[in-house]
Amino acid sequence: MKKQLSFPQGFWWGAASSGPQTEGQFDKAHENVMDYWFRTAPEAFFNGVGPDVASDFYHTYPEDFRLMKEIGFNSFRTSIQWSRLIKDFETGEADPKAVEFYNAVIEEAKKNDIELVLNLHHFDLPVELLQQYGGWESKHVVDLFVKFAKTAFEYFGDKIHYWTTFNEPMVIPEAGYLYAFHYPNLKGKGKEAVQVIYNLNLASAKVIQLYHSLGLDGEIGIILNLTPAYPRSDAPEDLAASQFTDDFFNRVFLNPAVKGTFPETLVKRLEEDGVLWSHTEEELQLIRENTVDFLGVNYYHPKRVQAQSNPEEYKTPWMPDQYFKEYEWPERRMNPYRGWEIFPKAIYDIAMIVKEEYGNIPWFISENGMGVENEGRFIGENGVIDDVYRIEFYEEHLTWLHKAIEEGSNCFGYHTWTAFDCWSWNNAYKNRYGFISVDLETQKRTIKSSGRWYRNVSNNNGFEVEVEE
């Protein structure tokens, strides 16, 4: 028997992307950290493919918006590149070519009846600010980010209703300072990572304060990657590992963003360990008073944790790993290409946490996706990639999201990652995520089976599922 799962009126159907992963480096005055990393170490990138052209959104955006409309998008998120928009980082002076480009993108979205969400930071710190000031370890960089935001709001604030400060800010300390998978590729820098976490929270609050002070008729939020930390067992030591992991990787951004305060248990632990961030009472007050209007949640996979069997190994230098250790759940279902567990129920668990512990703030799924390698082998006789695995992935996640909405979750949209295949940092184009395939040699776009499926979902504001009678 089939049942129609219908979503709330006005529900967002669309996808997310970012400037550094799609635009290419055309007409940019500055390099971001990813541009620099590729230029200095191209061998670190899959097949030696960098961000110089990427998906060529800088030139193809009119076609891309037309295709997005064709597959049912009513909304789309991308980002403004700090290294593109700003000519002089110290003054916040804009580059006229960048202003012209982003205005054209905004106009094209409007022409196609697509609500454009603009994000201000997607792992793309200008490399000069890392080299001169130490990047996000520096509060001067926080202030320069506010100047960048001010310029963006002055040029585009009256044209864009939905803004976000950061995409997945936790990835910056995690990838750049703790585990070395994004530039500057540092490892074991726990104390520095803790300061970066604080400074990013401060930067977000300062930009929110600025936005509201300008009297703009819109809303501003943040995009967080929430990865529920499921304990291996109900043993006290596993539960403690789960709580620490949740505090350190999720709530250290979620709490300040929505409640204006940091998790007390985490602050106490960091203080006891002598690694608490440098802060002032004035800064904490500013964070308290400038919370988000809405929340975006990126969900890909859960964390599964247990007590750390060898905590001493992670105490000098300080690392969060002394309090938890990941483990492989025997019943896990994996995406073998990306190495991530597929666990759709977590999207429901996140929704219930936001509802019950965070005032049921308006929120949306801002990314959810499945990256698959060598998708060319799934091309059918019609020349279309028949990505039924992606359709099944989305249907499972949407079914759990629908259940959460039925139970009162204030979720207003579902964005996938991503609209068209894009450059994924040092994985480049290894795993493809899009509804629309991109031929890197010709930049030709072709809608996949999942794109046609998504059009039907959007047109019907829902989809049918099989249920037992």
Whereabouts are the PLM-identified features?
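Active-site-adjacent substrate/metal-binding segments within catalytic domains
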Residues: 23-102
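Active-site region of glycoside hydrolase catalytic domains
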Residues: 2-45, 89-90, 99-469
